[in-house]
């Protein structure tokens, strides 16, 4: 029943938005279109996935497939990272460099009581990192630092290959990726 209703709502929204002008700001249709898009985004941000790992329940806001996949593979994608966090002393300070959506920041803060500095330069991931921190009531444990870390003090370009929530593998000050190949910058 839930999938059926979701399908009906999606089709109504698609039909409505296809008739709405895309640029005439004075149009009632345009304003209605913006309103509908805002309501749709609000609904997307209400999707929460809970993952239980070693008795610690973590909540993740999952508005798209990629963020949902990251939450679902939390325990299997980087088992060595989880082992490392488990080996830390309780209350240790942790720097999560490239925190993305905060998967490991959340776990360290919840499981070890760590004070976490979550470095994440992607504007597309910062919103979910903040929402995930809030959903898990860890604002007092996780400090979000919206900058890239480098071995130099400078201003440079952030080469983003992905503009989705949960996107990764971007570079700071370099136009090649982890594999040494030139990256196709999607957003600079």
Where would I find each of the regions flagged by the language model?
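S-adenosyl-L-methionine
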Residues: 1-188
């Amino acid at each position: 029943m839930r999938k059926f209703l979701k399908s009906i709502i999606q089709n109504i929204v698609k039909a409505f938005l296809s008739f709405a002008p895309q640029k005439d700001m004075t149009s009632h249709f345009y304003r209605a279109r913006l309103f509908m898009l805002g309501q749709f985004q609000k609904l997307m941000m209400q999707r929460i996935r809970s993952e239980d790992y070693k008795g610690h329940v973590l909540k993740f806001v999952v508005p798209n497939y990629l963020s949902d996949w990251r939450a679902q593979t939390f325990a299997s994608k980087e088992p060595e990272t989880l082992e490392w966090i488990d080996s830390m002393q309780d209350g240790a300070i942790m720097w999560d460099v490239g925190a993305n959506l905060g998967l490991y920041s959340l776990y360290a803060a919840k499981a070890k009581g760590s004070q976490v500095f979550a470095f994440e330069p992607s504007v597309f991931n910062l919103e979910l990192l903040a929402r995930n921190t809030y959903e898990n009531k860890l604002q007092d444990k996780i400090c979000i630092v919206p900058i890239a870390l480098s071995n130099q003090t400078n201003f440079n370009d952030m080469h983003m290959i992905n503009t989705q929530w949960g996107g990764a593998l971007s570079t700071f000050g370099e136009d090649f990726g982890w594999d040494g190949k030139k990256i196709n910058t999607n957003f600079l």
